[in-house]
């Protein structure tokens, strides 16, 4: 049984196959590959973009979607993860998409399920489909020529599952990664590090990936105000100038903290393209895992 818990679960050849399939799915036409199949979404953390993206992907493939209301679920009343998995499995879904605030939960569920489990984000650990759609966006923009491209990841890197998954995946595809964050947001890493964003860093980048500050994962206040943070790390036109680059963000964007209003409307900012690409990538992932499992 194959699952998608981290980006390491797919090799490079499989990822390129996913990209080819996702490119076909960008036409947004409905398909029947998963007609008669059932996909369950269970999100223990709030989500608008990822949840709706997975559900759109499932429906475009012809699948039925069962969204479990976690606020009313037995898990909120003390049910163990093992019992949650057993009950989910008893419903005989063809795949489950799960998000949880605690790292490792999707892997635990996967050990007790008889269908593929897709990690929709777990704690600070991983968000594999976000990294796949980010690389897909980069790959398409540079027409497949991604090796050696310089990417600067800016923000709350230490607490970001998006950063963790992207660093693994982008490293495998030989992108040149630089991290920019305040010391308390910087992970221990061998990668190039800077503690303040400046125009020289941006001038030396092909891609900027801005991250949201993960305030819900902080045990204490780390900045007197988000405005103080923005002074050092907000992506602004005055820094980007006319540099030929692309700007990514996993969303939701804190405007004028992560990215300025002016840059959000700049043609180099591909946030909405990431959203479109995300549905296509998730279609490719769901199709691959479900049909391989049944083949």
UniProtKB/Swiss-Prot annotation:
It is an enzyme of class 2 (transferase). Pathway: Pyrimidine metabolism; UMP biosynthesis via de novo pathway; (S)-dihydroorotate from bicarbonate: step 2/3. It catalyses: carbamoyl phosphate + L-aspartate = N-carbamoyl-L-aspartate + phosphate + H(+). Keywords: Pyrimidine biosynthesis, Transferase. Pfam families: OTCace, OTCace_N. GO terms for molecular function: amino acid binding; aspartate carbamoyltransferase activity. InterPro entries: Asp/Orn_carbamoyltranf_P-bd (IPR006132), Asp/Orn_carbamoylTrfase (IPR006130), Asp/Orn_carbamoylTrfase_sf (IPR036901), Asp_carbamoyltransf (IPR002082), Asp_carbamoyltransf_Asp/Orn-bd (IPR006131). GO terms for biological process: 'de novo' pyrimidine nucleobase biosynthetic process; 'de novo' UMP biosynthetic process; amino acid metabolic process. Carbamoyl phosphate binds at residues 49-50, 99, 127, 130, 251-252. Catalyzes the condensation of carbamoyl phosphate and aspartate to form carbamoyl aspartate and inorganic phosphate, the committed step in the de novo pyrimidine nucleotide biosynthesis pathway. NCBIfam families: asp_carb_tr (TIGR00670), PRK00856.1 (NF002032). Heterododecamer (2C3:3R2) of six catalytic PyrB chains organized as two trimers (C3), and six regulatory PyrI chains organized as three dimers (R2). Belongs to the aspartate/ornithine carbamoyltransferase superfamily. ATCase family. This is Aspartate carbamoyltransferase catalytic subunit. The gene is pyrB.
């Amino acid at each position: 049984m194959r699952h998608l818990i981290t980006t390491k679960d797919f090799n490079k050849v499989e990822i390129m196959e996913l990209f080819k399939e996702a490119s076909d799915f960008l036409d947004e036409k409905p398909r029947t590959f998963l007609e008669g199949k059932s996909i369950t979404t269970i999100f223990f953390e709030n989500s608008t973009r990822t949840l709706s993206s997975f559900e759109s992907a499932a429906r475009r493939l012809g699948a039925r979607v069962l969204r479990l209301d976690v606020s009313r679920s037995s898990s909120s009343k003390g049910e163990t993860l093992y019992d949650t998995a057993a009950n989910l499995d008893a419903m005989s879904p063809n795949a489950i998409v799960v998000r949880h605030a605690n790292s490792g939960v999707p892997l635990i569920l996967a050990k007790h399920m008889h269908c593929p489990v897709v990690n929709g984000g777990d704690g600070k650990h991983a968000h594999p489909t976000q990294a796949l759609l980010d690389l897909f966006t980069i790959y398409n923009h540079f027409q497949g020529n991604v090796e050696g491209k310089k990417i600067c990841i800016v923000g709350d890197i230490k607490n970001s599952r998006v950063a963790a998954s992207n660093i693994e995946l982008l490293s495998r595809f030989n992108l040149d990664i630089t991290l920019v964050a305040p010391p308390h947001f910087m992970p221990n890493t061998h990668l190039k590090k800077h503690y303040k964003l400046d125009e020289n860093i941006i001038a030396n980048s092909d891609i900027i990936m801005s991250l949201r500050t993960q305030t819900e994962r902080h045990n204490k206040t780390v900045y007197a105000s988000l405005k103080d943070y923005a002074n050092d790390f907000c992506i602004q036109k005055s820094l980007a100038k006319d540099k030929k680059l692309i700007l990514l963000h996993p969303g939701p964007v804190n405007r004028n903290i992560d990215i300025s209003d002016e840059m959000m409307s700049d043609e180099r900012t591909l946030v909405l393209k990431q959203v479109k690409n995300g549905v296509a990538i998730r279609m490719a992932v769901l199709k691959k895992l479900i049909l391989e499992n049944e083949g």
